[in-house]
Curated annotation (Swiss-Prot):
Quaternary data: Homodimer.
Lineage: Bacteria, Bacillati, Actinomycetota, Actinomycetes, Mycobacteriales
Known role: Transfers an acetyl group from acetyl-CoA to L-homoserine, forming acetyl-L-homoserine.
Organism of origin: Corynebacterium diphtheriae (strain ATCC 700971 / NCTC 13129 / Biotype gravis)
Protein name: Homoserine O-acetyltransferase
UniProt keyword Transmembrane helix present: no
Active-site residue list: 136 (nucleophile), 303, 333
GO biological process: homoserine metabolic process; methionine biosynthetic process
PANTHER family attached to this UniProt entry: HOMOSERINE O-ACETYLTRANSFERASE
AB hydrolase-1 domain span: 41-339
This protein's record includes keyword Protease: no
Major place of residence: cytoplasm
């Protein structure tokens, strides 16, 4: 039975088999849900790479009674992704032998993340989802939901992501993985009985954060300013004499290292590298055109990580485009998490459109 009190709930889903042929035993998926569940009013939110199931914390002001995602009308559910570290089975979780999975944890794809979530819903008796909404990695999962299990969802909203990982994205994401693997405490992923690779994950976050924010925003905030009380222009290089932007990025890295597991970061980043909606489906455009679920697309005009042209590509090729929206912001990729006024307006528009969708018409399209 679905728990809708907003508390973190841990649900065992049994063994899980990845699409590449690996087995995870006795998997747990954690989730949180808010609002009264009627069986037909479920909205599923898909979090980004280092997010979690507590959607109210990362979309504060958008979820609740009378808000864009109205808990008086809908039940809002968000899982912690398989491979994560916030309650779901991941590299830090116990293997059947009692030790952490560590290096034995298998590689995952975006499709695996979706299928694990589907397995959770099967255990909870959920067979109808009004809408699935996700940004960044959550957007990739939303897109795969529409390709893998269209019969379960009425509509979807895909935000700030592409149809597949680009070579640039794979390159920048692999650099982050390398930063973690080069930390001497990484130990091939088997570090849970000792010192965690905090320096590695902090460095990975510094790289990633520059892709999450806009170049204009970063430059306007920091420019070439020195960190208060420091001088980066001295006669000799000193890592303790920093530019302000360096201090800011180091702070972002430390914050993530304190709350997120490096093993999960590697597994989920690799899953993003494997993202390709066209794999095994005749290529990108054929796969997109075969999606009959009505999908709304949104992107950020200054996004470096998933440039807006990638959302335009989705909009041109999806088999059933519901609508398109642009988030205008100097912030860059993270704007879908920070531009709350724009996101509220866009989400309300999406919900209005979703309520007007004729399920019987979509069923005819699928035949």
């Amino acid at each position: 039975m679905l728990t809708t009190t907003g508390t973190l709930t841990h649900q065992k889903i049994g063994d899980f088999y990845t699409e590449a042929g690996a087995t995870l035993h006795d998997v747990t998926i954690a989730y949180q849900a808010w609002g009264h569940y009627t069986g037909t009013n479920l909205i599923v939110l898909e979090h980004a790479l280092t997010g979690d199931s507590n959607a109210i914390s990362w979309w504060d002001g958008l979820i609740g009674p009378g808000k864009a995602l109205d808990t008086n009308r809908y039940c809002i559910l968000c899982t912690n992704v398989l491979g994560g570290c916030k309650g779901s089975t991941g590299p830090s979780s116990p293997h059947p032998d009692g030790k952490p999975w560590g290096s034995r944890f298998p590689a995952l794809s975006i499709r695996d993340l979706v299928n694990a979530e589907k397995q959770l819903f099967d255990h909870l008796g959920i067979n109808k989802i009004h809408a699935i909404i996700g940004g960044s990695m959550g957007g990739a999962r939303t897109l795969e939901w529409a390709a893998l299990h269209p019969h379960m969802m009425t509509t979807g909203f895909v935000i700030a992501v592409s149809a597949r990982a680009s070579a640039w994205q794979i390159g920048i994401q692999t650099a982050q993985i390398s930063a973690i693997e080069l930390d001497p405490h990484w130990n091939g992923g088997d570090y849970y009985s000792g010192h965690a690779p905090w320096e590695g994950i902090a460095a990975a976050r510094r790289i990633a954060h520059l892709t999450y924010r806009g170049e204009l925003e970063i430059d306007e905030r920091f420019g070439t300013s020195a960190q208060h009380g420091e001088n980066p222009l001295g006669p000799f290089r000193d890592p303790h004499q920093r530019f302000a932007v360096t201090s800011y990025l180091q702070h972002q890295g430390i914050k993530l290292a304190q709350r997120f597991d490096a093993g999960s970061y590697v597994v989920l980043t690799e899953a993003l590298n494997r993202h390709d909606i066209g794999r095994g489906r005749g290529g990108l455009n054929k796969a997109l055109s075969a999606i009959t679920v009505p999908i709304m697309i949104a992107g950020v005009d200054t996004d470096i990580l998933y440039p807006y042209h990638q959302q335009e590509h989705l909009s041109r090729n999806l088999g059933n485009l519901l609508a398109m929206a642009k988030i205008s912001s100097p912030v860059g990729h993270d704007a879908f998490l920070t531009e709350f006024r724009q996101m509220e307006r866009i989400l309300r528009h999406f919900m209005e459109l979703s309520e007007g969708i004729d399920d019987s018409f979509r069923t005819k399209l699928e035949r």
